[in-house]
């Protein structure tokens, strides 16, 4: 099976030169995804809203790949302020509470100071 590239239409993908996701066989690798609404290229100041939008963006990429959040096997969370991570848990549990992928949280700077969380996932089509 040929490698397939998935785009969200984000200007970041075009400007930087990457794909929102790459499908290789049954594996789907979703790039680090932030809380921007790609239709308007706007981002909320609210951490929970950003977290929710991240996961909506990821779900859209997975659906383009013929998959869903239920197929996520690994997730990495990146927050500039690691102390804020517990605030995200209710939103994360809403999406991953039954899926329970392997997970890691990293505290590191992000590309834009408006970004408060970035999420990267790997999924295996079932």
Question: Model-flagged regions — what are they?
Answer:
Residues 1-126:
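Short, polar/acidic, helix-capping and beta-turn segments at strand->helix junctions
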């Amino acid at each position: 099976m040929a490698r397939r590239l998935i785009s969200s239409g984000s200007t970041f993908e075009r400007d930087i030169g990457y794909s929102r996701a790459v499908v290789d066989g049954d594996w789907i690798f979703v790039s680090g995804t932030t809380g921007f609404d790609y239709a308007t290229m706007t981002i909320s100041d609210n951490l929970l809203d950003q977290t929710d939008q991240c996961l909506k963006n990821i779900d859209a990429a997975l659906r383009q790949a013929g998959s869903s959040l239920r197929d996520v096997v690994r997730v990495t969370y990146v927050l500039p302020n690691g102390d804020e991570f517990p605030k995200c848990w209710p939103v994360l549990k809403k999406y991953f509470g039954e899926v329970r992928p392997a997970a890691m949280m990293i505290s590191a700077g992000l590309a834009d100071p408006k970004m408060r969380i970035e999420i990267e996932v790997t999924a295996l089509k079932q």
